């Protein structure tokens, strides 16, 4: 058996355009924007161009819009793209909103997708400090749970796992059953 020191559920909302994102975080029906510590975006100038992808974090719990905006060093250059998709993520349990845990999740996400993330250069060699497992849940902008066959060129695994022996595992649940 393997010892998993940290297990987190991340709830992702998206895909959103930039206007939808701004409207979503300001919405009165939205969970508190300060709960969102993670963001992922992908963009391409047009259908002939390759996708550019970036995953990032906002360690302060003062609203994701303070980080993911037109002044962002990577995001700003893609605002004029024809295809721009944004996902924002929060811990399912807000007690996990601590800087070290946010950073650990970011490192796992970057390691899992480093070959597809074109804009994450600094953290590609950095590993989580201990074993960690992430369960991703996907929601649309109305906060309805989505099935797991969602069109995403990247970043679509339900489970991500890192073991201290430099073992990475990732994948999707083959079948999700809803007991309604």
Regions from the PLM with identified roles:
Residues 1-53, 57-180:
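Boundary/linker segments flanking structured domains
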């Amino acid at each position: 058996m393997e010892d998993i020191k940290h297990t987190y559920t991340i709830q992702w909302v998206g895909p959103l355009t930039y206007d939808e994102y701004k409207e979503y975080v300001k919405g009165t029906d939205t969970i508190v924007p300060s709960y969102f510590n993670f963001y992922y975006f992908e963009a391409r100038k047009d259908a002939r161009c390759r996708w550019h992808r970036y995953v990032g974090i906002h360690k302060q719990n003062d609203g994701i819009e303070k980080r993911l905006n037109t002044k962002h060093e990577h995001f700003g250059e893609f605002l004029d793209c024809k295809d721009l998709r944004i996902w924002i993520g929060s811990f399912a349990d807000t007690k996990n909103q601590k800087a070290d845990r946010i950073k650990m999740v970011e490192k796992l996400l970057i390691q899992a997708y480093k070959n597809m993330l074109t804009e994450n250069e600094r953290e590609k060699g950095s590993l989580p400090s201990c074993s960690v497992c992430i369960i991703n849940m996907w929601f649309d902008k109305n906060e309805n749970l989505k099935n797991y066959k969602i069109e995403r060129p990247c970043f679509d695994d339900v489970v991500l796992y890192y073991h201290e022996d430099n073992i990475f595992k990732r994948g999707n649940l083959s079948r999700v059953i809803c007991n309604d």
